[in-house]
């Protein structure tokens, strides 16, 4: 007996229900240039060895971050990950585990999530943290939705310090969640952003990033005071979580919700994902927090144990009452974060942050000596922005030809903004050596 799960009649019936004439109509949003007609012309009857060689030749056309001096950041940072991290997360109990619905058989998973939450709460200066989001951007979007629930208001203000891709996620949610956004223009380093003038009685929250998209560190205290005076919440976004080892945590500056990207700890660049979103808030807002919360308890015999304390998502309760519809979280990335953070310890975390800051300062001092280069930042962590005498995209391409990946042209994420055409965002971490910095300085002198 043959099982045919989708016949032509099935397709016609399904298309009729949704009002589409053909399957192709379902993909009309995909640009024509991105579509492929027919089968891919692959070589036939190749053995495993031949396939490996062919793929190796294709891969050799790329320039891996580890093979050249690499100075790209802007939300994804290359840090050293201890070998112990990957070794431990590949244990089958962790690698293939699922959501810990049955605490009697998932104590290991629940405990590391509990430890993860504790670490996130400590470094952000908040009282409670959840068991992670998909990434920093989705965490930011969920934070805005949470602020609406808490304040019963429907308008948010996005600072120009916010990463454009984070802002795009929030804007995407606003289109479907029926709330209003006020998006401020990019906050260039050295230029004061008049965000206080945009905080009114009708807003639910103000979203500010530190370090900002251009690397600038920001004092959140005056913004927090202004927001609280109007009954609004302050959402602090931290795309480089290692920075909290060197600066005052957002929670201590008055933030009500802190979201961030945890990729820098325990995780590689991973081709842009999967990453691990961090989400922390104050205890009084805990029941409005999205995602899951693991808690500590005791069993019937008085033994310490861990459980899913809160999990108010649409799978468990009525959709209209759920705080989010987030499903499988970034559990394995959480574990990598937790292991790396445990290996570092509090002092190691702070020391690594100091090393990163020193690396960026040394690079900025070198590049500032190059004729035509201007460092714009007054205060930064491990990332800064410089103004060049020609378009930054052209300079980056020329640097690649010299064997240096020199940073991210701001225009790549802010197309059409004339003020950023000559701005290059540069990151330097503990990975970068003095030889890397010297190579960058020499290459930049040549291409300018």
From Swiss-Prot:
Gene3D superfamilies: Aspartate Aminotransferase, domain 1, Type I PLP-dependent aspartate aminotransferase-like (Major domain). GO terms for molecular function: glycine dehydrogenase (decarboxylating) activity. InterPro entries: GcvPA, GDC-P_N, GDC_P, PyrdxlP-dep_Trfase, PyrdxlP-dep_Trfase_major, PyrdxlP-dep_Trfase_small. The keyword Hydrolase does not apply. Its EC number is 1.4.4.2. The keyword Oxidoreductase applies. It comes from the Bacteria. Pfam families: GDC-P (PF02347). The glycine cleavage system catalyzes the degradation of glycine. The P protein binds the alpha-amino group of glycine through its pyridoxal phosphate cofactor; CO(2) is released and the remaining methylamine moiety is then transferred to the lipoamide cofactor of the H protein. This is Probable glycine dehydrogenase (decarboxylating) subunit 1. It comes from Parvibaculum lavamentivorans (strain DS-1 / DSM 13023 / NCIMB 13966). The gene is gcvPA.
């Amino acid at each position: 007996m043959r099982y045919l799960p989708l016949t032509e009649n099935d397709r016609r019936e399904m298309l009729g229900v949704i009002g589409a004439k053909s399957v192709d109509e379902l993909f009309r949003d995909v640009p024509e240039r991105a579509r492929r007609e027919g089968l891919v012309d692959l070589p036939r009857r190749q053995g495993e060895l031949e396939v490996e060689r062919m793929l190796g030749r294709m891969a050799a056309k790329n320039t891996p971050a580890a093979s050249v001096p690499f100075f790209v950041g802007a939300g994804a940072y290359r840090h050293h990950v201890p070998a112990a991290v990957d070794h431990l997360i590949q244990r089958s109990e962790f690698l293939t585990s699922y959501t810990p619905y049955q605490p009697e058989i998932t104590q290991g998973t629940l405990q590391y999530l509990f430890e993860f939450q504790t670490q996130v709460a400590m470094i952000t200066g908040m009282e409670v943290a959840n068991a992670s989001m998909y990434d920093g951007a989705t965490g930011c979007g969920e934070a805005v939705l949470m602020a609406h629930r808490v304040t019963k208001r429907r308008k948010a203000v996005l600072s120009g310090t916010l990463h454009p891709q984070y802002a795009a996620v929030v804007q995407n949610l606003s289109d479907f969640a029926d709330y209003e956004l006020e998006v401020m223009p990019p906050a260039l380093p050295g230029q004061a952003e008049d965000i206080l003038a945009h905080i009114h009685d009708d807003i639910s929250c103000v979203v500010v990033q530190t370090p900002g998209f251009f690397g600038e560190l920001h004092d959140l205290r005056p913004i927090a005071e202004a927001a609280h005076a109007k009954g609004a919440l302050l959402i602090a976004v931290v795309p480089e979580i290692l920075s909290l080892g060197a600066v005052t945590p957002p929670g201590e500056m008055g933030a009500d919700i802190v979201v961030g990207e945890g990729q820098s700890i325990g995780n590689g660049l991973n081709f842009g994902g999967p990453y691990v979103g961090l989400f922390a808030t104050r205890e009084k807002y805990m029941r409005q927090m999205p995602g899951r919360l693991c808690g500590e308890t005791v069993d019937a015999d008085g033994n310490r144990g861990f459980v899913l304390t809160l999990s108010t998502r649409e799978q468990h309760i009525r959709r209209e009452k759920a705080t989010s519809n987030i499903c499988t979280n970034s559990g394995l990335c959480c574990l990598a974060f937790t292991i790396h953070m445990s290996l570092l310890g509090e002092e190691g975390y702070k020391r690594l942050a100091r090393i990163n800051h020193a690396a960026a300062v040394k690079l900025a001092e070198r590049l500032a000596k190059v004729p035509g280069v201007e460092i714009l930042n007054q205060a930064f962590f491990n990332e800064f922005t410089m103004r060049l005498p020609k378009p930054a995209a052209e300079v980056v391409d020329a640097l690649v030809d010299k064997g240096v990946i020199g940073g991210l042209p701001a225009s790549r994420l802010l197309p059409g903004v004339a003020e950023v055409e000559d701005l290059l965002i540069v990151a330097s971490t503990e990975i970068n050596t003095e030889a890397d910095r010297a190579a960058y300085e020499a290459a930049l002198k040549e291409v300018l």
